[in-house]
């Protein structure tokens, strides 16, 4: 079993990249390799983070079937949370490390020498920052499919197995996800890496009012229930 890194033990600068390869569809990819050049995957455990939209289900194209799924995680409050701040910094460091590697290997990866600025513009970063600063940064992991269904283990707060549909919007979750290669669209008009979620643990659910919750306001008594009709019958 590959080691599972946390934000504290994850070292982006130690990640190496192999030579260009072709997938079954003819597209190219760059495998992640260890220090001996053997293909490997990097498995990372994300700290507890807010899941504002729940598990997102969508179609890449209207005619595509089945659905695709992703886990969109918010860095809300990361400025004062050591673990989420460290993850944000490590993912940013990994983005820069990958862009540096792409620039150094531009001819092999893209067929020609590209400027670092162009590589930055076409690279899909692991963190998405709101330009206005109104919303917290986000990061995303995708969920692979097996036989058309989400291929991920999901655990409730009591560690029992649940389905992706049971994860509520606004929950706090931990995710274990992995990356294994660098992907490219076309000749490199878009490129990057994608975390694939392996396991998801719900650590906290949003509060819901399940019991009677109305309270009397100051100086107000509980109003009597009227049995009279609201309007007189004509």
Language-model regions: role of each:
Residues 5, 10-12, 39-41, 180, ...:
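N-terminal functional modules and adjacent low-complexity/disordered segments of proteins
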Residues 128-205:
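Extended serine/threonine-enriched, polar tracts that run as long, contiguous segments within proteins
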Residues 205-234:
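Long, low-complexity intrinsically disordered regions
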């Amino acid at each position: 079993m590959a080691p599972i890194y946390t934000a504290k033990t994850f070292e982006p600068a130690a990640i190496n990249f192999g030579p260009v390869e072709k997938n079954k569809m003819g597209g190219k990819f760059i495998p992640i390799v260890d220090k001996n050049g053997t293909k490997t995957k990097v498995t990372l455990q994300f700290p507890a983070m807010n899941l504002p939209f729940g598990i997102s289900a969508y179609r890449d194209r209207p005619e595509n079937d089945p659905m695709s799924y992703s886990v969109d995680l918010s860095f809300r409050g990361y400025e004062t949370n050591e673990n989420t701040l460290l993850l944000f910094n490590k993912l940013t460091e990994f983005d820069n490390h990958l862009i540096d590697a792409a620039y150094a290997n531009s001819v092999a990866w893209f067929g020609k020498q590209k400027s670092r600025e162009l590589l930055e513009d076409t690279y899909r970063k692991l963190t998405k920052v709101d330009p206005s600063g109104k919303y917290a940064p986000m990061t995303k992991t995708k969920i692979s499919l097996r036989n058309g269904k989400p291929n991920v283990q999901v655990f409730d707060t009591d560690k029992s197995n649940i389905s992706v549909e049971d994860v509520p919007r606004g929950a706090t979750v931990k995710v274990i996800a992995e990356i294994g290669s660098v992907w490219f669209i076309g000749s490199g008009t878009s490129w990057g890496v994608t975390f694939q979620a392996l396991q998801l643990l719900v650590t906290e659910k949003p509060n819901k009012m399940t019991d009677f919750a109305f309270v009397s306001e100051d100086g107000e008594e509980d109003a009597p229930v009227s049995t009279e009709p609201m309007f007189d019958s004509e």
